[in-house]
Amino acid sequence: MNAKFILLLVLTTMMLLPDTKGAEVIRCSGSKQCYGPCKQQTGCTNSKCMNKVCKCYGCG
């Protein structure tokens, strides 16, 4: 019973994880390093360096 529940929980978690294929990881040490790459991806410079990875916000 417990093994079935754990297996079901693992399978459900795996299916709910976001698909990150094709997403480009941009490494950074400061937010200024994110402006150019994010402008190429989204068309806007709205970005932030968090945990040494750029987070692009896009326009709006």
Curated annotation (Swiss-Prot):
InterPro entries linked: Scorpion_toxin-like_sf, Scorpion_toxinS_K_inh
Annotated site, Basic residue of the functional dyad, chain positions: 48
GO terms assigned for molecular function: ion channel inhibitor activity; potassium channel regulator activity; toxin activity
SUPFAM superfamilies per UniProt: Scorpion toxin-like (SSF57095)
Record flagged with keyword Disulfide bond: yes
Main location: secreted
UniProt-annotated site: Aromatic residue of the functional dyad, residues: 57
Subcellular localization, as worded in the UniProt entry: Secreted
Pfam families: Toxin_2
UniProt keywords, alphabetically: Amidation, Disulfide bond, Ion channel impairing toxin, Neurotoxin, Potassium channel impairing toxin, Secreted, Signal, Toxin, Voltage-gated potassium channel impairing toxin
Entry keyword Iron: no
Cystines in this chain: 28-49, 34-54, 38-56, 44-59
Membership in a protein family: Belongs to the short scorpion toxin superfamily. Potassium channel inhibitor family. Alpha-KTx 06 subfamily.
Domain notes: Has the structural arrangement of an alpha-helix connected to antiparallel beta-sheets by disulfide bonds (CS-alpha/beta).
Known function: Inhibits Kv1.2/KCNA2 and Kv1.3/KCNA3 and weakly inhibit Kv1.1/KCNA1 voltage-gated potassium channels.
UniProt name for this protein: Potassium channel toxin alpha-KTx 6.10
Organism: Opistophthalmus carinatus (African yellow leg scorpion)
